[in-house]
From Swiss-Prot:
Protein name: 1,4-dihydroxy-2-naphthoate octaprenyltransferase
Family listed: Belongs to the MenA family. Type 1 subfamily.
Pfam family, one: UbiA
Organism: Haemophilus influenzae (strain ATCC 51907 / DSM 11121 / KW20 / Rd)
Protein function: Conversion of 1,4-dihydroxy-2-naphthoate (DHNA) to demethylmenaquinone (DMK).
Length: 308
């Protein structure tokens, strides 16, 4: 019984380290990219490609979360003073060596899933080499956010990375794998999705702003300061909403293209709360909320395309 309880506790720690509340970010961009692909080419839509895109992106997200905890632990950034939840490695439930092996396992799983995806979806050698390169870049980016001599997350570049990988590549890459074409219109929802994902990261950074500043982790929130960081958050949300709206106006055939507007009151309420917050601790429950709002907007946007 004791052994079973220990195993369950260990699995629980690994589950917490995977940060399931961040996984909607992985789903959102793939749903949107897949819906755009179906909208543009319903006859050529490949369900297996969509499933593999989802799997690969989830694995990359978990890899990034493992790497984040490992890197912050190695640099002493995650202390008991942090407002966010304590991770398995902070509690001593997972050792640095175990987490490193977890990282290696996730690299292998991401690589295998991505390779299978490319093998199924590519049409020519250019596609093969381009997406192989992007896949390797995604793995490297997931690790070097906090791991390495000069992790870019410590230089305030995390927001740009999230915009690229959860927006331009997540949406645009999925769309291309479904249609094997490029449409300039998709840049709008791709940017919108990326900005919403960046808003999730910004909430995390605003919450941990004091501890990050002490540890020398110069996130964009640390560089801007608390007030400007909250203003920046509202700008992210406003521009994201405008991107989805601009796409709907430019391409709308049916009123259903505006379904995502149903989530705008939630987005506005969230923005007001963040802007009016005075203490980082107030933002602790808001990260999961922002993640779910992002997923909801992308689901409604995707649904509008599919039934329009």
């Amino acid at each position: 019984m004791r052994s079973k309880k220990m195993i369950n506790e260990k699995l629980k720690m690994w589950w917490e380290t995977a940060r399931p509340k961040t996984l909607p970010l992985a789903l959102a961009s793939i749903f949107t990219g897949s819906a755009l692909g179906y909208w543009a080419n319903p006859q050529g839509f490949n369900g297996l490609v969509m499933v593999l895109c989802l799997l690969t992106t989830i694995l990359l997200q978990v890899l990034s979360n493992f790497a984040n905890d490992y890197g912050d632990h190695q640099k002493g950034s995650d202390t008991e003073e942090r407002i966010g939840p304590l991770r398995g490695i902070q509690k001593g439930a997972i050792s640095a060596k175990e987490l490193k092996w977890g990282l290696i396992l996730m690299v292998m799983a991401s690589f295998l899933s991505g390779s299978f995806l490319i093998g199924i979806a590519y049409e020519n050698l250019s596609d093969l080499f381009a997406f192989a390169g992007l896949g390797i870049l995604a793995i490297v980016a997931a690790i070097t956010y906090t791991v390495g001599v000069k992790p870019y997350g410590y230089m305030g570049l995390g927001d740009i990375s999230v915009l690229v990988f959860f927006g331009l590549l997540g949406v645009g890459g999925t769309y291309y794998l479904q249609t094997h074409s490029i449409d300039s219109h998709i840049i709008l929802p791709a940017i919108g999705s990326g900005l919403l994902a960046s808003a999730v990261l910004n909430i995390n950074n605003l919450r941990d702003i004091e501890q990050d500043a002490k540890a020398g982790k110069n996130t964009l929130a640390v560089r801007l300061g608390a007030y400007k960081g909250r203003v920046y958050h509202c700008i992210l949300l406003s521009v994201a909403a405008l991107c989805y709206l601009a796409f709907a106006v430019a391409t709308a055939i049916s009123w259903t293209n505006y379904l995502f507007v149903l989530a705008m009151p939630l987005l506005a309420k969230h923005a007001i709360f963040v802007y009016c917050s005075q203490q980082p601790s107030e933002l602790r429950p808001i990260l999961a909320q922002m993640s779910m709002i992002s997923l909801l907007i992308n689901i409604l946007f995707s649904l509008g395309l599919l039934i329009g």
